[in-house]
Amino acid sequence: ILGLVYLSQKEGVPKVISGASVTLQLLLQVVSGVIVFVMTLPFWGNAEAGTGLYGLLVLLPVGLIFLHPALVNRGLNLALRITGQPEMELSWRYSYLLGQLGLWGIFWLVNGVAHYFLIRSIYSSSLPPIPVLAGIFAIAWVAGFLSLVTPSGLGVMEGTLVFLLSFYFPVHVATVIALWSRFARTVGDLACATIAWGS
């Protein structure tokens, strides 16, 4: 977060605005990740884990409530006070936030498609449905982000992936998939950073 704020500041974006933008992005990313995971549970079919997690459907309305502009503004100003920044009132409409949430939902589904082909590149047997993979990788990212103890959720994200993927793959295969995903993400991040730095 601090890195994004710093780089935005170098481009002339006020620190308060960039901080609010990054905070909103992460909030939407977390809420959408949880919602996508919960909404894809019916695609688990007869998998043992899927039938035991239907109680998480209650998180759907909870996530939508947390995105109400009044609560978002309150949480944002709390974060600004903690960091010693002046408070601000952002006039976000609920429809705007829900639209952004929908776009993040599409992102997680595309992420599931990408991981389907990533797994297919190293594993030739049958794979879980794409919605299941989308939900697994979404909630694994959320778990890694919320851990706050390791950079980029290192270890926590992989552990979550291995646990959830092990309902469909042998544990050693799930472990390889988790590591392969981390490697691909790291290479992608470095490539994007190199391109941005060069421009």
Predicted feature locations:
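Predominantly cytoplasmic-facing regulatory/coupling regions of multi-pass membrane proteins
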Residues: 41-145, 170-199
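Membrane-interface alpha-helices at helix entry/exit sites of multi-pass transporters
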Residues: 1, 9-26, 170-180
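Select subsegments of transmembrane alpha-helices in polytopic membrane proteins
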Residues: 23-32, 100-107
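Helix-to-coil boundary motifs at intracellular loop junctions of multi-pass secondary transporters
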Residues: 10-11, 121, 164, 168
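Short, membrane-exposed interhelical loops at transmembrane-helix boundaries
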Residues: 160-174
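Transmembrane alpha-helix boundary and packing residues in multipass membrane permease domains
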Residues: 5-6, 116-120, 163
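Mid-bilayer segments of alpha-helical transmembrane spans in multi-pass integral membrane proteins
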Residues: 1-2, 26-38, 66
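Transmembrane helix boundary and interhelical junction motifs in multipass membrane proteins
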Residues: 1-4, 143-162
